[in-house]
């Protein structure tokens, strides 16, 4: 629906602004000689990039920061760089879920506190997780979420046998 599309785009735009903010903070920290902050922010980006590689099932994927336009693109071997908004509905839905969780976990970082490594504890409810996901993505989504967010308990409703069979517990 139009409302879903608008919400997905809003969260994606917030995530991209957040990532630009992190790159800016990393540059300031580098200029100030704060190697610890530089490294921790780099670890955040490395982990996010690794998650994209797993999610998109493509090891050649890398994030590309366009500092002139304050934007991130996804670079894949043998393909022109593309924007997050160019992902299919299925991948966009997963990025929406991941972005929402990242932003909620990292909200404290925006307030000047510890940088999250996605290890916050909590419970997340997702209704009909299979919506917009093709079969291969349905098979990967729960293992991906539980690996990327190890301390989150996911409670999911689904009609998909692929999601149900994708995880042992």
Residue ranges and their predicted role:
Residues 37-48, 56-57, 71-85:
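Accessory N-terminal region flanking or inserted into the helicase ATPase core
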Residues 62-66:
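Short beta-strand
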Residues 69-169:
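Switch/communication elements of ASCE P-loop NTPase nucleotide-binding domains
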Residues 1-55:
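Coupling/switch segment of ABC-type P-loop NTPase heads
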Residues 53, 57-58, 150:
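Residue-level recognition of short, structured coil/turn motifs
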């Amino acid at each position: 629906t139009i409302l879903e599309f608008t919400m997905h785009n809003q969260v994606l735009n917030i995530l991209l602004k957040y990532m630009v903010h992190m790159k800016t903070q990393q540059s300031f920290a580098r200029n100030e000689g704060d190697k610890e902050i530089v490294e921790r922010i780099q670890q955040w980006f490395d982990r996010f990039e690794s998650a994209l590689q797993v999610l998109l099932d493509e090891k050649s994927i890398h994030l590309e920061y366009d500092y002139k336009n304050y934007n991130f693109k996804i670079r894949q071997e043998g393909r022109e760089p593309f924007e997050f908004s160019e992902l299919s509905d299925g991948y966009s839905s997963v990025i929406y879920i991941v972005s929402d969780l990242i932003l909620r976990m990292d909200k404290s970082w925006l307030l000047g506190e510890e940088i999250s490594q996605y290890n916050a504890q909590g419970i997340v409810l997702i209704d009909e997780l299979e919506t917009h996901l093709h079969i291969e993505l349905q098979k990967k989504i729960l293992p991906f979420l539980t690996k990327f967010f190890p301390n989150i308990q996911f409670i999911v409703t689904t009609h998909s046998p692929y999601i149900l069979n994708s995880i042992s517990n």
